[in-house]
Amino acid sequence: WIMGHMVNAIAQIDEFVNLGANSIETDVSFDSSANPEYTYHGVPCDCGRTCTKWEHFNEFLKGLRKATTPGDSKYHEKLVLVVFDLKTDSLYDNQASDAGKKLAKSLLQNYWNNGNNGGRAYIVLSIPNLAHYKLITGFKEALTSEGHPELMDKVGYDFSGNDDIGDVANAYKKAGVTGHVWQSDGITNCLLRGLDRVRKAVANRDSSSGYINKVYYWTVDKRQSTRDALDAGVDGIMTNYPDVIADVLNESAYKAKFRIASYDDNPWETFKN
């Protein structure tokens, strides 16, 4: 999965997919009542990027729905996965469940079209704080009470705080999560970070007792760091330059081993060689 980083304006969906992304990451900010409010990152952000592009969250969802609904004039067949980077650090811990419920209702109405031929992309809820695990249970409760528990089949999870892998496993246990797990590791492109924790996550993914289904690394903008991440065995790379990742995947060393995921590739299944 080539994951376009910080796609917060509707116009950027086309831009990143046209550069080769089959997945996008979108920032979601919340108001003081735990309602998802804007797709907005703010300052500071990655080097070389404008930090302040934004939409109202529900409007962004409508644009995203068009981009992922077959037959729509804005449809992109290859856009198959969306990571919502949930900026819950502005909330109190006891608001996490409410944030999950409100997020689910927004998605149900504006993205999934109340279960009636809505957008088809898989969704990852990426949460920065392990203490906010109830966002997951709240999300699930809301979809169930709204009569659409089947949509949970399209939803996966990530804790994005670079926490100890054992602590992450524990948070999932508390949330009742037993699958659909993506594990992120990374740092802003302004700084360097080694691949030690990525390798631990990959080892967990590949062990019979692991909780991780997929591993992605962020934010990778250079060819050599792309090669290093691929050599470590990641499933996804988040980038400001999807074309750079696509170029490296075309190199002979990687062409035989990796391919760009399509809609038929289940993002919740661990890939077995």
Swiss-Prot record:
It catalyses: an N-(acyl)-sphingosylphosphocholine = an N-(acyl)-sphingosyl-1,3-cyclic phosphate + choline; an N-(acyl)-sphingosylphosphoethanolamine = an N-(acyl)-sphingosyl-1,3-cyclic phosphate + ethanolamine; a 1-acyl-sn-glycero-3-phosphocholine = a 1-acyl-sn-glycero-2,3-cyclic phosphate + choline; a 1-acyl-sn-glycero-3-phosphoethanolamine = a 1-acyl-sn-glycero-2,3-cyclic phosphate + ethanolamine. This is Dermonecrotic toxin LapSicTox-alphaIB1aiii. Dermonecrotic toxins cleave the phosphodiester linkage between the phosphate and headgroup of certain phospholipids (sphingolipid and lysolipid substrates), forming an alcohol (often choline) and a cyclic phosphate. This toxin acts on sphingomyelin (SM). It may also act on ceramide phosphoethanolamine (CPE), lysophosphatidylcholine (LPC) and lysophosphatidylethanolamine (LPE), but not on lysophosphatidylserine (LPS), and lysophosphatidylglycerol (LPG). It acts by transphosphatidylation, releasing exclusively cyclic phosphate products as second products. Disulfide bonds join C45-C51, C47-C190. Mg(2+) binds at E25, D27, D85. It is found in: Secreted. InterPro entries: PLC-like_Pdiesterase_TIM-brl (IPR017946). Keywords: Cytolysis, Dermonecrotic toxin, Disulfide bond, Glycoprotein, Hemolysis, Lipid degradation, Lipid metabolism, Lyase, Magnesium, Metal-binding, Secreted, Toxin.
